[in-house]
């Protein structure tokens, strides 16, 4: 018997590339249960374990295929506890025409349509472009004639992946500038200025040569996970201390995941580079599915009306420990550190809020205690 397409997928693991749209929520766009009666050409098949309670209890098989110019996925769910099997067909995205190719100072990048970026000249010449964003922002590395580099985040241009309204992207980036000022910290990227320009809004930050933990940057991710264990321990403590600082200032982290964490190897500095969606507490889930990566999101971040607070962030920070030390694998077998530290991380990612640590400071204290016992 096949369950209906409204069955919600577990979110303890995510496939490479973080295909969160299909992994973490009910099928969209009229997803149907198996049977399909749709002709398709198989592209690839990958199996992923979903780790629950420290053992492999649920398995997914994800197959991508194309139907009439659209990209779809089938998702085979096998629950080893209940013996239920189901196949879901999910429309992933419309196939679009090749995006417009823009060029600035010899650097090519993708856009949905032409746009005038001449306002960037006030900061110098573009040497790097980050165009693969779905937030409505496009980011630039710009260097002036004296060699000073800055990072410019801009909203208001027709980026290749954004499907929302230009005005929403501008409002979001404008609002975020206040967060960087309110949470100024040695481990947060420094905001230089944020203002209207180029028909949109730009925030200008100090440049950093730090490498990113995020999987969307494979070479940097590979370099990050090869850092010595002690270095990654320092990175994790820095993340905990910053989130504790933010909580004391009255903020809850939203959209905190591996791609927001960087490490400057030369200066031995952890850098948090994106707090755009942090919120002032008290706050609740008003979206149904909050911004974020499925590998880091707590159950309440999928529940409309649920409270979002420090306990929510305890879950995310537990998930961050698994990202830093075991490539997001939550099994005891994959954990390279002590069993005491594993117990701390595992408690933090408990599905039930009451089973987690009651605050970020409590998580930090438990981690430091377990670390001390290891030495």
Regions found by a protein language model. Name each.
Residues 264-291:
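Activation segment/activation loop of eukaryotic-type protein kinase catalytic domains
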């Amino acid at each position: 018997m096949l369950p209906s397409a409204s069955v919600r997928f577990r979110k303890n693991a995510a496939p490479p590339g973080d295909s969160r749209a299909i992994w973490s929520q009910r099928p969209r766009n009229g997803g149907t249960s198996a049977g399909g009666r749709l002709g398709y050409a198989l592209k690839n098949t990958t199996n992923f374990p979903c780790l629950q309670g420290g053992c492999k209890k649920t398995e997914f098989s994800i197959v991508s295929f194309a139907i009439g110019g659209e990209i779809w996925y089938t998702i085979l769910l096998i629950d080893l506890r209940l013996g239920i099997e189901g196949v879901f067909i999910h429309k992933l995205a419309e196939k679009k025409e090749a995006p417009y190719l823009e060029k600035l100072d010899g650097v090519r990048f993708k856009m949905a349509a032409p746009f005038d970026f001449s306002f960037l000249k006030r900061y110098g010449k573009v040497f790097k472009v980050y165009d693969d964003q779905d937030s409505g922002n496009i980011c630039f590395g710009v260097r002036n004639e004296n060699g000073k580099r800055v990072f410019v985040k801009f909203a208001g241009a027709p980026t290749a992946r954004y499907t929302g309204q230009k005005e929403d992207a501008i409002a979001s980036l404008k609002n975020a500038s206040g967060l960087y000022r309110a949470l100024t910290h040695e481990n947060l990227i420094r905001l230089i200025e944020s203002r209207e320009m180029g028909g949109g809004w730009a925030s200008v930050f100090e440049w950093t040569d730090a490498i990113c933990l995020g999987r969307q940057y494979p070479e940097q991710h590979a370099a990050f996970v090869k850092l010595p264990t002690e270095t990654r321990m320092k990175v994790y403590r820095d993340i905990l201390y910053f989130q504790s600082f933010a909580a004391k200032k009255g903020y809850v982290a939203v959209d905190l995941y591996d791609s927001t964490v960087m490490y400057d190897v030369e200066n031995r500095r952890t850098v948090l580079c994106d707090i755009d969606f942090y919120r002032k507490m008290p706050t609740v889930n008003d979206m149904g599915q909050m911004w974020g990566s499925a590998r880091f999101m707590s159950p309440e971040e999928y529940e409309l009306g649920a409270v979002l607070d420090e306990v929510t962030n305890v879950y995310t920070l537990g998930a961050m420990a698994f990202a830093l030390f075991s490539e997001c694998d939550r099994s005891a077998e994959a954990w390279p550190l002590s069993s005491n530290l594993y117990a701390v991380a595992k408690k933090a990612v408990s599905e039930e809020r009451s089973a987690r640590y009651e605050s970020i400071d409590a998580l930090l204290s438990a981690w430091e205690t377990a670390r001390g016992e290891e030495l």
